[in-house]
From Swiss-Prot:
It comes from Brachyspira pilosicoli (Serpulina pilosicoli). Involved in the binding of tRNA to the ribosomes. One of its GO terms (molecular function) is tRNA binding. The gene is rpsJ. GO terms for cellular component: ribonucleoprotein complex; ribosome. Part of the 30S ribosomal subunit. This is Small ribosomal subunit protein uS10.
């Protein structure tokens, strides 16, 4: 029989928020007796946008903005019904996107 595994992917704009969320997930899963691998930091995606500062004069004057998306990966092995219930009941901040597979 194949071992049951849950893969949790976290995405957020704030690095402190994603690290706190990952630690709370790991702590709640370890209480149920499951094995945890992670949080594994994935590459940060950076999107840069360049805009012109003024609409008419100084066309060479530009300003750059960037948006960073931080990602973490957590693998959970030996999943029990208590593990899934603890993940369902876990309250995470609004700025963190969670994907379960």
């Amino acid at each position: 029989m194949k071992e049951q595994k849950i893969r949790v992917k976290l995405k957020a704009f704030d690095i402190e928020l994603i690290d706190q969320s990952a630690q709370s997930i790991v702590a709640s899963v370890k209480k149920t007796g499951a094995r945890v691998s992670g949080p594994i930091p994935l590459p940060t995606s950076i999107r840069k946008v360049t805009v012109i500062r003024s609409p008419h004069v100084n066309i060479k004057s530009r300003e750059q903005f960037e948006m960073r998306v931080y990602k973490r990966l957590i693998d959970i092995f030996d999943v029990t019904p208590q593990t899934t219930e603890s993940l369902k009941k876990l309250a995470l901040p609004a700025g963190v996107d969670v994907q379960l597979k």
